[in-house]
Amino acid sequence: AKQLIKNPNITWKDVDASLPNTKIEVLGPPPTSGTRDAFAELAMEGGCKTFKWLKDLKKENKKRYKAICRSVREDGPYIEAGENDNLIVQKLTANPKALGVFGYSFLIENSDSIQGSYIDGVLPDFDNIAQGEYKVSRPLYFYVKKAHIGTIPGMKEFLREFTSDKAIGEDGYLTDKGLIPLPDKEFSKFKTAARKLTTLEALN
C-alpha cells in the first residue's frame, strides 16, 4: 500500500532548493467558506488526481480520499483568515511574500497592490478564465425549478434579470462581482433557454 509522509517543510527552499528561503504562509478562508470548498475541489483535489493511486483511492475509499486530498496543514503554514476576503487582501499587502486564497473580484479590485498566481503557467485573467484555461476556476450553474415559475412571485422576472445583458453580459454589473461572462455563442444559447424555460434534458 502507498504511504504518506509528514510534511516538515517550513520554507519554500525546503520544498525546492531553487526557491527562496522564505517562510511558507498561505492565507485563506475556513472550511465553512464556499471559496475554501472550491479551492479544495479544484486545486487540492486537482493535485491529488495527478497521482494514480490517489485517483484510484477515490473509488475505493471516498472518506480516506477526502481526508487526504482536502486537508490543510494545521502547524502554521496555512492561516485561516476568516471569510472576509478584504482582510486577506490587507494581510497580503502587508506581507508580499505570502499567498492568499480568495475570489477573483478582489484580485481585480486590488490589482494595484497584489497579483494573481500562475497555475501551470497560466495567469488568472479575464480571457484565461473565460476559456477555461485557468484550472482553479469553475463555472457557476444557475438552476430553476420550472414548476415554480408562475407560482413563486418574481421568479420569472429574477430569471430574466440574471440572464440579461446588463447583468451577465460583457459589461454587466455582475462582472464587477467577479463573474466572467460566457462567450457570445454560449451566452445566447442559455439566455434563450431561460426565456423559453427549456429543461436541462432538452438543453443537453
Residue ranges and their predicted role:
Residues 1-204:
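Flexible loop/hinge segments at secondary-structure junctions
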